[in-house]
């Protein structure tokens, strides 16, 4: 992969989030999501991948998954079935910075370890659209305040593309209100909830 293509990246990535630190972090992610959704919430899971966040949801939640890759579709649907979660999965192979959902169609958008993979040219539109379609947006993302914003963390083998976005500034400049903000220095992850102001 000579340049970064989000869809190609996910179609080629095997066993995402399978290393030990990610297993430990997943429990923190699930807990954070549970703290920020209600029993009967209608949820948009933006980038559900293999379904590692599904344990945060209950049978009563109405969950729509939105992903750009079908690589993990069967694994995701099987996990949802095992957890008795009715999941409406939308696979859209075009990178959309404008969604077809209605304003406030969802009670919450949940997006865990997804925004960090969105290129700087798309991040503002994506964050604004997520806030448009739900009353609140629940995010966990890689964040390293010691490196320049909108730079990427790229290994020589091109197996990882992570962008360090200035989420506070994006929210400020786009009338998005941050309701909670927590930083995990050890994991270099930000946990935050935002909405339209």
Regions found by a protein language model. Name each.
Residues 110:
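A conserved beta-strand element that flanks and buttresses the S-adenosyl-L-methionine
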Residues 1-40, 46-98, 118-125, 129, ...:
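Class I (Rossmann-like) S-adenosyl-L-methionine-dependent methyltransferase catalytic domain
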Residues 98-104:
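Short amphipathic alpha-helix with an adjacent loop that forms part of the alpha/beta core around
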Residues 38, 104, 132-133:
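Structured loop/turn residues at beta-strand edges in well-structured enzyme cores
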Residues 113-117:
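Short catalytic micro-motifs in class I SAM-dependent methyltransferases
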Residues 107:
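Acidic donor-binding loop of glycosyltransferase active sites
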Residues 134-138:
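Short glycine-dipeptide loop
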